[in-house]
Curated annotation (Swiss-Prot):
Catalytic activity: [6)-beta-D-fructofuranosyl-(2->](n) alpha-D-glucopyranoside + sucrose = [6)-beta-D-fructofuranosyl-(2->](n+1) alpha-D-glucopyranoside + D-glucose
Outcome of substituting D308N: No change in activity
Gene Ontology BP annotations: carbohydrate utilization
PTM notes: Does not seem to be N-terminally processed.
Entry protein name: Levansucrase
Family: Belongs to the glycosyl hydrolase 68 family.
Disulfide bonding pattern of the chain: none
Organism: Zymomonas mobilis subsp. mobilis (strain ATCC 31821 / ZM4 / CP4)
Resulting phenotype, E117Q: Does not affect sucrose hydrolase activity. Exhibits greater transfructosylating activity
Major subcellular site: secreted
Gene that specifies this protein: sacB
One Gene Ontology cellular component: extracellular region
Binding sites annotated in the UniProt record for sucrose: W47, D48, S119, R193, D194
Length: 423
């Protein structure tokens, strides 16, 4: 069904769908992480992480170096629980996608006009030799602001290291409009962040996914029958469910510089189900569109429950859907009940590898925990139609390249991808 703008109406993640979520499902549960995990750097907390990639989603190697980006905070200044107060985007590099070396902060000091740098994505600018664009969330506490933004610069490398230049001017891209997506006036618990930029293979246009909330005054609308879905007889929906209204949003780029954007209606909404659908991203495979997001146990609506982890939706009709929850419930990769907070902020790459960061690992003493702030073991995910399966555990922080970036054109990068696959 299309709305007046000619865009498909949002697909619904219903309460009936979420009732099928089961923690410890063996095909959708992350294996337990050992208490004695290694730390990639003892100077910085590391959490939300994403690779350097092309605009089509493939992980890029630049002059033989793999590069990843992460939110980081100085361990000597911030504790694990207040790390967001010092959040900046840092970068790491390695040969082959493991044993990462910290390179520094990406943005120049003072470039961000707001207090914090939160999650997004980083791409090689198409058709360029070494131009890089980071899309991130520029965040302020007072006044409350959360703005998807862009910053541009250049990547350089030699035999010893990788470094960046530029990244000294931030451009705001779009803001919550109160029409498609709740703004602060409508919902002071609003979410509007985590831009993920990509080219849609169906129409060749550039879009950005992001986390948002359904546009409405928080708590003023009752959860309807469509949002509830086909539930068993006598199933009651708690009144408090109306306070949860997550949405996976999308915007369309209006120029080649990717600095001007138009907001479109949400792709998926979770009104009455969950209040957060963070870091949405997309994988196109075998004619299907897989939409992934992450969410918390703590953000589920009253009367529902599920683990921290990855949730997903699949469309047989391209990026605008309609979507159905993967595995019937939406759960793709959850934490085990024995370690419910072991990992978070999973990112599913186009090769099926899933990276995340370690959060909190319990010891044999139930009163003793170890905070992570480092990358978790990488998981291999198999996507088969409307189902997903956990199949392998790789090394800690293993993020290998899929293509070698070549400056000439996109066709040469396709050839480089085949070369890497054949190695």
């Amino acid at each position: 069904m299309l709305n007046k703008a000619g865009i498909a109406e949002p697909s619904l993640w219903t309460r009936a769908d979420a009732m099928k979520v089961h923690t410890d499902d063996p095909t959708a549960t992350m294996p337990t992480i050992d208490y004695d995990f290694p730390v990639m750097t003892d100077k910085y907390w590391v959490w939300d992480t994403w690779p350097l990639r092309d605009i089509n989603g493939q992980v890029v190697s630049f002059q033989g170096w793999s590069v990843i980006f992460a939110l980081v905070a100085d361990r000597t200044k911030y504790g694990w629980h207040n790390r967001n107060d010092g959040a900046r985007i840092g970068y790491f590099y390695s040969r082959g996608g493991s044993n990462w070396i910290f390179g520094g902060h990406l943005l120049k000091d003072g470039a961000n006009p707001r207090s914090w740098e939160w999650s997004g994505c980083t791409i090689m600018a198409p058709g360029t030799a070494n131009s890089v664009e980071v899309f991130f969330t520029s965040v302020n506490d007072t006044p409350s602001e959360s703005v998807p933004a862009q910053c541009k610069g250049y990547i350089y490398a030699d035999d010893k290291s990788v470094w960046f230049d530029g990244f000294d001017k931030v451009t705001d891209l779009f803001q919550a409009d109160g029409l498609y997506y709740a703004d602060y006036a409508e919902n002071n618990f609003w979410d509007f962040r985590d831009p993920h930029v990509f080219i849609n293979p169906e129409d060749g246009k550039t879009y950005a996914l992001f986390e948002g909330n359904v546009a409405m005054e928080r708590g003023t609308v009752a959860v309807g029958e469509e949002e509830i879905g086909p539930v068993p007889p006598k199933t009651e929906t708690p009144d408090g469910a109306r306070y949860c209204a997550a949405a996976i949003g999308i915007a369309q780029a209006l120029n080649e510089a990717r600095t001007e954007w138009k907001l479109l209606p949400p792709l998926v909404t979770a009104f009455g189900v969950n209040d957060q659908t963070e870091r949405p991203h997309v994988v196109f495979q075998n004619g299907l569109t897989y939409l992934f997001t992450i969410s918390h146990h703590s953000t589920y609506a009253d009367g529902l429950s599920g683990p921290d982890g990855v949730y997903g939706f699949v469309s047989e009709n391209g990026i605008f859907g309609p979507y159905e929850p993967l595995n019937g419930s939406g759960l793709v990769l959850g934490n085990p009940s024995s370690q419910p907070y072991q990992a978070y902020s999973h990112y599913v790459m186009t090769n099926g590898l899933v990276t995340s960061f370690i959060d909190t690992i319990p010891s044999s003493d139930p009163n003793v925990y170890r905070y992570g702030g480092t990358l978790a073991p990488t998981i291999k995910l198999e996507l088969v139609g409307h189902r997903s399966f956990v199949t392998e555990v790789k090394g800690y922080g293993y993020i290998p390249p899929q293509i070698e970036w070549l400056a000439e054109d996109e066709s040469s990068n396709s050839a480089a991808a085949l070369s890497l696959l054949n190695k």
